[in-house]
Amino acid sequence: MTDAAVSFAKDFLAGGVAAAISKTAVAPIERVKLLLQVQHASKQITADKQYKGIIDCVVRIPKEQGVLSFWRGNLANVIRYFPTQALNFAFKDKYKQIFLGGVDKRTQFWRYFAGNLASGGAAGATSLCFVYPLDFARTRLAADVGKAGAEREFKGLGDCLVKIYKSDGIKGLYQGFNVSVQGIIIYRAAYFGIYDTAKGMLPDPKNTHIFISWMIAQSVTAVAGLTSYPFDTVRRRMMMQSGRKGTDIMYTGTLDCWRKIARDEGGKAFFKGAWSNVLRGMGGAFVLVLYDEIKKYT
């Protein structure tokens, strides 16, 4: 194997392992966030049974669905997240070679910053093309509030993918893909671009104290998450459309979804679950730092 291939494989492994560990740890927060985002578009959650907020959600989930339901959709998320994050990190470095080749970060700051934004955004969009059906399934499984058996919309990951494919074809598994690409470019651009730029400005980036790295990563994930959150809400709502027919369809398309959420629920609705997203972002910050630490030993 060439040095480039070995480097690519190390990036893939380090990113994937770090992501799988952190995602499982924050899975309960992730599910709360998803339920708050999509409950208005769920056939299972009637208006009188909607969650009032994070605390209400955390209290009611174990009572109504059991404690283990906090991890509903987590298998799909781990399977999805391993290649997603691994591909993001691996492609990020490849795109950095394209966008940042020959750029001096000290004398060409804005070009360096723009190159980091471009490489982060392109990496996120590229990896999304490969794993979107898994992201779709994770969302639908997390949104499934049935207690067990017949009450559940889907029995598991495979059942979800098969049912939606039979009902809507491949299009159903990619529902909300366009707005996802828009959101992922914004999120990844900030996530990687600002993080790498900030680390690059440090006197000795390779030997930065882990606490400083974590603080930078924490700030980056919070800002990136809030900036792209409305796009995430719209894409999750669009995912809830798959498998529906006729009058059950709430939104005719992405623009209609944006318009109806703003008109019927107000601007705040785009940010439902955003606070839990910031908490979840601690896991994302941990991934960035853990990835750098793992790479030191590989």
UniProtKB/Swiss-Prot annotation:
In-chain residues carrying the UniProt-annotated modification N-acetylmethionine: M1
Positions of modified residues (N6-succinyllysine): K43, K105, K147, K155, K268
Positions carrying N-acetylthreonine: T2
Renumbered ranges of Solcar repeats: 6-98, 111-201, 212-297
Main subcellular location of this protein, as a coarse class: mitochondrion
Important for transport activity: annotated segments: 235-240
Residues that bind ADP: R80, K92, R235
Disulfide bonds: none
Positions in the Mitochondrial matrix compartment: 38-74, 131-178, 232-273
UniProt modified residues of type N6-methyllysine: K52, K147
Family to which the UniProt record says this protein belongs: Belongs to the mitochondrial carrier (TC 2.A.29) family.
Name assigned to this protein: ADP/ATP translocase 2
Species assigned in the record: Rattus norvegicus (Rat)
